[in-house]
Amino acid sequence: MKNKVVTSKSEMESIIRKCQTCSISMVDTEGKPYVIPMNFGYKEEVIYFHGSPKGKKADVLRNNPNVCVMFSTDHQLRYVNEDVACSWSMRYRSVIAYGKAEFVEGPKDKIDCLNIIMSHYADRSFEYNDPAVREVMVFKVQVEKMEGRTYGY
């Protein structure tokens, strides 16, 4: 069975909405790949993230904003014959998005982004205190290109 290319934007966005986390990959200052799992929010072809303004992720993004974000969901192990290793496979739905990380500054803009992130996980509004908003790093990725694939569906 071959994997199926997903070309429908609405189907790719449906896959993204089903994911609880994503993996964001970047290239560090030594030219080596660096990938980390993250919580996220998604709205109108923009992916939103938050984290500490200190550390490797922040340093890497400041040096090179090019990123690739991978979403994967609906994993299900399957096999034709459980005694034949090569008949085992994994069903999945996935999306890969490419873009550039852009840091968000200013309390109102940060809060807007944090609300988009939180709306992915909870159907309610939140309040944020000034020190938390001031200290958090918020960045967004405008999707430049998106590719989807499914296998077994």
Residue spans for each PLM region:
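Short, intrinsically disordered, mixed-charge
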Residues: 17, 62-67, 116-123
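Beta-strand-connecting loop/turn residues
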Residues: 45-46, 65, 144-146
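Short beta-strand segments
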Residues: 19-53, 69
